[in-house]
C-alpha cells in the first residue's frame, strides 16, 4: 500500500526510499555522515485500505490532511475525506475545530505555543483516531552551503546545514530540503551524544559527472526547512528509515488504527540559490 504525505506547511513529502548507495565500500563513511534520504514513495507493508491522517500544529497554523489509502491491487488514487470532525486541544485549555477546505485538507488559524502538549482527535465514519505531540522551541539556522568532497577517486556535492542546539533541554530535529518546491532530501537528528553544541547535518546531493534527476542545475532554488520536533515524532520518522530493514511500517503515531502522524513543531526556513561556481571544495 502506498501513500505520500501532503505538500502543505509541514511539507513532509516523505516517501519510501532506498539508501543512497555508493559504488565502493570506501563511500560508506560519507553515507554515515550524511544519513539523509531521497524523496521516494512509501511502500507500506499492509494490504487493507486504511485511513491516513497527516496533521500538524506549527508556529503559523494548525492543519490536517485526511484520506483513505487504496488496496495494493487498486490502481485508483487515494480518496480524500471531506466529512471528518477534526479537533485539536491543548493542555493550556485551548480548543480548535479545524474547518474543511478542499482535497481532504482541514485548517485552523491558531498557532502552537512552545511547551503545550496538543491532542488531536479525528472522527470519521464511526472510526476514532487520536494522537498527542508537544510543541517545541524555535530553532535557528546558522548557515547552509554546498561543498565538493573527494571520496576515493570521485567528487561529490554535499549540502552542509549548521545550526545551534537549543541549550538545557533534550532536542529532536527534522530537516527537509526542497528543490524548486519539490522535496529533495530529508533527515532527522537528535542531540543525545553532544547536547548544547553546534549541530551539523550533511546531505548527499549527487556525484559529479552524473546526469540524473538528482543533479543540481545553476539557478535551482533550494528551500531549507529546519523543524524542532518532539520525541514521538522523531521516533516515527526514524522508524521510517528502518522500513527496508525491518519489513514493517513506521511505528504507530495514532491510536485507532490509521496511518500517518501528528506533529507539533516550530519551523524556520532559509532560501539558497545553487551556483556551481560558488561550490566550495573541502578535504
Please place each PLM-identified region on the residue numbering:
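C-terminal motif of bacterial Sec signal peptides marking the signal peptidase cleavage site
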Residues: 32-35
Amino acid at each position: 500500500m502506498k501513500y505520500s504525505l501532503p505538500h502543505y506547511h509541514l511539507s513532509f513529502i516523505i516517501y519510501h526510499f532506498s539508501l543512497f548507495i555508493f559504488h565502493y565500500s570506501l563511500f560508506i563513511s560519507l553515507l554515515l555522515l550524511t544519513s539523509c534520504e531521497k524523496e521516494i514513495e512509501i511502500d507500506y507493508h499492509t494490504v487493507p485500505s486504511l485511513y491516513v491522517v497527516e496533521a500538524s500544529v506549527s508556529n503559523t497554523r494548525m492543519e490536517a490532511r485526511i484520506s483513505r489509502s487504496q488496496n495494493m491491487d487498486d490502481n485508483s488514487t487515494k480518496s480524500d475525506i471531506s466529512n471528518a470532525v477534526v479537533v485539536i486541544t491543548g493542555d493550556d485549555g485551548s480548543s480548535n475545530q479545524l474547518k474543511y477546505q478542499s482535497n481532504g485538507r482541514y485548517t485552523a488559524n491558531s498557532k502552537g505555543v512552545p511547551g503545550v502538549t496538543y491532542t488531536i482527535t479525528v472522527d470519521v465514519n464511526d472510526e476514532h483516531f487520536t494522537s498527542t505531540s508537544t510543541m517545541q522551541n524555535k530553532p535557528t539556522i546558522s548557515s547552509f552551503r554546498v561543498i565538493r568532497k573527494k571520496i576515493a577517486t570521485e567528487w561529490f556535492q554535499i549540502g552542509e546545514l549548521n545550526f545551534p542546539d537549543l541549550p538545557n533541554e533534550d532536542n529532536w530535529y527534522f530537516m527537509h530540503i526542497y528543490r524548486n518546491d519539490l522535496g529533495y532530501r530529508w533527515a532527522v537528528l537528535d542531540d543525545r551524544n553532544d547536547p548544547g553544541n553546534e549541530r551539523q547535518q550533511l546531505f548527499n546531493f549527487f556525484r559529479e559527472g552524473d546526469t540524473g534527476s538528482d543533479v543540481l542545475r545553476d539557478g535551482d532554488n533550494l528551500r531549507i526547512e529546519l523543524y524542532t520536533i518532539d520525541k514521538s515524532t522523531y521516533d516515527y520518522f526514524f522508524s521510517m528509515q528502518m522500513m527496508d530493514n525491518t519489513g514493517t511500517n513506521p511505528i504507530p503515531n495514532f491510536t485507532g488504527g490509521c496511518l500517518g502522524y501528528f506533529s507539533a513543531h516550530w519551523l524556520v526556513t532559509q532560501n539558497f540559490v545553487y551556483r556551481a561556481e560558488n561550490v566550495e571544495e573541502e578535504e
